[in-house]
From Swiss-Prot:
Swiss-Prot/TrEMBL cofactor(s): Mg(2+)
One CC-aspect GO term: cytoplasm
Location relative to the cell: Cytoplasm
Presence of keyword Magnesium: yes
Protein name: Phenylalanine--tRNA ligase alpha subunit
Catalytic activity: tRNA(Phe) + L-phenylalanine + ATP = L-phenylalanyl-tRNA(Phe) + AMP + diphosphate + H(+)
């Protein structure tokens, strides 16, 4: 009789535990609360484990009955906890959606329009002008060898012209190109004349940063090789380009020196009442052509180079090159 009472008592405790646990799980408000319930109900020291320890008072016939009932209660409580957790997640998502609901009657903030950077638009315009004159665009590596950047352009080692531009050397033989002229040499190695190309791209020089200098800037170089090309063709091409880009603006040519052209000239335009250098140019030195296996008696040509930043500054009356690189929207939104 005592065993029957013990069986009834244990079953009663299990039933009470199940009812109370069901209610607590349904009323739980958070994951952490559910985790605490799981530990207090089903943990090693939980209420279910405490009840099951009293099974030792039962006969071998009754113990399986309690064990089976306890196992069913455990499975049911685990399922209830999982279900309530999923319900809490769903409720949280619904609340977030409700809180973040967009009121379509509120005026939109709009999207700020984007535009090309002034340097990019300036370079694109320069390229378009020369393409209209029959030139094609060629590109080359920014990391160059000493040969392509200097020696192939009639600037051998220890030549005094190398003092004209400080260079970023990566090692004894590799450097960051100081001009885009190496593109012209690479192209001529694989393409016989006649040639009309332009080479746009970034170049690097060890200049101190100030209002008119930057260690990194953009350059466009021009190369024309054909029969019977002379300085008048160079002058005509440069004047046509400058008139197309700047409009009717005073231009002058000044004699100058470059190792890879002879004769050479610098080109100035009037800016704010003063002459400002904007291009360097000249007839390609026959030695440069001969090194490439090109007959300099049959083929002649001219080369010219310009800085995109300088052209952009003149076009838009910008007095400091550093403005191009500060990403100041107050400046950029003007273009």
């Amino acid at each position: 009789m005592s065993q029957i009472e013990s069986l009834s008592q244990i079953e009663g405790k299990l039933n009470n535990l199940s009812l109370l646990a069901n209610e607590n799980i349904k009323n739980a408000k958070s994951d952490s609360e559910l985790d605490q319930l799981r530990v207090s109900l089903l943990g090693k020291k939980g209420e279910l484990s405490i009840i099951l320890k009293t099974m030792g008072k039962l006969s071998s016939v009754d113990r399986p009955i309690i064990g089976q009932k306890a196992n069913l209660i455990k499975i049911n409580l685990q399922d209830l906890i999982t279900e309530r957790k999923n319900q809490l997640i769903s409720e949280a998502i619904d609340k977030q959606i409700e809180d973040e609901k967009i009121d379509v009657t509120i005026p939109s903030t709009g999207t700020l329009p984007g535009n090309k950077h002034p340097l990019i638009s300036t370079q694109d315009e320069i390229i378009d002008i020369f393409c209209g004159l029959g030139y094609s665009v060629e590109n080359g590596p920014e990391i160059e060898s000493d040969f392509y950047n200097f020696e192939s352009l009639n600037i051998p080692k220890n030549h005094p012209a190398r003092d004209m531009q400080d260079t970023f050397y990566l090692d004894e033989n590799r450097l960051l190109r100081t001009h885009t002229s190496p593109v012209q040499i690479r192209y001529l190695e694989n393409n016989p004349p006649p040639v009309r190309i332009i080479a746009p791209g970034r170049v690097y020089r060890r200049d101190a940063v100030d209002a008119t200098h930057s260690p990194v800037f953009n350059q466009v170089e021009v190369l024309c090789i054909d029969q019977d090309i002379n300085f008048s063709h160079l002058r005509g091409t440069v004047l046509t380009f400058l008139k197309t880009f700047f409009g009717d603006i005073p231009v002058r040519f000044r004699a100058s020196y470059f190792p890879f052209t002879e004769p050479s000239a610098e080109v100035d335009v009037q800016w704010k009442g003063k002459w400002l250098e904007v291009m360097g140019c000249g007839m390609v030195d026959p030695k440069v052509l001969e090194k490439l296996g090109i007959d300099s008696e049959k083929w002649t040509g001219f080369a010219a180079g310009l800085g995109v930043e300088r052209f952009c500054m003149v076009r838009h009356q910008i007095d400091d090159i550093r403005r191009f690189y500060t990403n100041d929207l107050r400046f950029l939104k003007q273009f």
